[in-house]
């Protein structure tokens, strides 16, 4: 029977305790043999039994092994004892023992002791031993393990001053650690590369791998590729992994996947890191086809249950929007670790399957899988999106029930939840409890307040952020939210200051920041400033075009909006539903039916997805162009009807005199479970107004207040006065005005003035006109209305006086106008105008129509 040599030594070591004669060689051999087998505690016990009887028996070669055992067990007590023996024996300057002591103290968590050992060794009388690179490497590595990077780099530089020539390990730990921590500059990295070349250290594959990683961290992918090409032996899978992950992390996903295929074709034995790196590239590029191929390779390699690979597969399918495939991967995993659950919850959350994410979270708890901070942050984000305040608050409570570390991600998610749900006190409590308020935290609070329409509070928080920490530089997300807050408040002056600060930092070039600036100037009535921002941005981005098209529509420049849309098409940029919706608003304001129908057809031909907003815009366009039947067809085919959809159709029927259908649609809306708002009732009262349904209008007005608790605004009151006035109920209209809980504005008195003139009520007409003239003394149309009223009542002197006063003030009435589109041409007609080139034909038609109406009146 054959015995291994170290087994013989072990038996000797164990038996020598009982022997009367102690053999130092046997004990040393036994200790080293035990340590080689990993039986560290037995080795230390064996050492302690004999150290007291004779401290001089231990060999100089045994101490490094003993210190290795102390490091493995992190046993500081034994380590100090052995250190004492080393000092007594005078071997503390031995480079092997010094290295072992430094490593032991670092492993046991006492860096200061390691520094004392190293300093004593490096300052020893033996100048030759102080140049041993192994000890320096241990000390540099120790500094880095304790994240004391400045001291580590200082030690490396001191080593060079001492004339110690770094080896491949020295350079690799400096390069890899400093790159990882971001405390390394490109110039320093290239200097180290040059040092390697000059000293023929470029043959070490481990060091070259660290160099490749360094260049990728610097964003120098070409330099990384050059180093990779120079390596002759490419059999090491770690090298391939660094390249695959590096290109993927640099956004060069195609090269990352090409390298994956190259490694596979060169028979490199791929490991889990290879697959996770390649799947990461597929996730970034949303390359589901290649991702499926890698999935097949994973199954062939038997890694389909590897937690890291499975997590990457779930992430890849999630980023590609393939939630079904992610569910399949998840269900096939036998041992579902927390990382797997988290990846599936994140997949649901990222793809707007919020309720599925919450269901899976509940299932996790049923399976007694304890969530971590990553789980809870995703769950809270889902609650925020779904508006589930109470559920989110219950999840927040779990942070207090169990010792889950509250990360900045969780705190930011909670800030967004509470801010979005309008729970400002809770949001501020979370914010104040944060030890470190980073950019994400400030951004979450500001963004949440903006989404909830609390723009003043958002700007105050932004000001507090600048006062709290000057070193924080707002990112594009925060500046977008701040600009949106300025737009919501129409705070032009502050918005200009924000714009100026963004020009200095270069953030204005960001597409979302630029679009928010366009929106700001649009809402402040400065389309020319919005255009300047637009022209400074990339013309290839759809968001910028949409913002500018919407800006022109909002500022009553529909023709410019339509022209800009056509320019966008001519530059090869295909519109989305937002573009179509914005330009439809412009077309609606011009009542250009042909353009509207043409755009509708274009949308259908290109297969642009029609969301609710787009369909609402189409309904609005057809209603305003007088084609309510087209609007009705779109309405009936809509599966999801928003409140705006119902309001548009009710308004459409009412504006075309079909009050009965409008009222019927209102009943249908209530049956569908949609609650009306103030706009709904305004449309209904307006419908009754157009059709002369006085009692129905009065009932709806009372119904709005009593049954739905909606307080009427000035438009509701104006429509009611107009309804009563048109029906000739002038005294009731005047009593209605006097009973209003708010002071009547000019629109109310204008309605009463028009009705007074129609029904020849001079007294109320004069009263209304006087009220109007006090409110708007420069309004010429009021003078004209009152002059006409005087003339019709035979009060010519009063009319002449008022006409003289009007001329004295230089006032005149803007003539009303109407237009009609015929053969793709818009014909405009002004009240009292006769400048049309076809005026003769027009007057002939008008005379014939008048004769026909007179004849029909006589016949009836």
UniProtKB/Swiss-Prot annotation:
Coiled-coil segments on the chain, per record: none
Region (Type E(+) motif): 824-854
UniProt keyword list: Repeat
Each PPR repeat, start to end: 59-93, 94-124, 132-166, 167-203, 204-234, 236-270, 271-305, 306-340, 341-371, 372-406, 407-437, 438-472, 475-509, 510-540, 541-575, 576-610, 611-641, 642-676, 677-707, 713-743
Transmembrane segments: none
Pfam families, per database record: E_motif (PF20431), PPR (PF01535), PPR_2 (PF13041)
One annotated GO molecular function: RNA binding
Residue numbers spanned by region Type E motif: 748-823
The keyword rRNA processing appears for this protein: no
Keyword Methyltransferase among UniProt keywords: no
PROSITE patterns in the record: PPR
GO biological process: RNA modification
Similarity field: Belongs to the PPR family. PCMP-E subfamily.
Protein's recorded name: Pentatricopeptide repeat-containing protein At2g40720
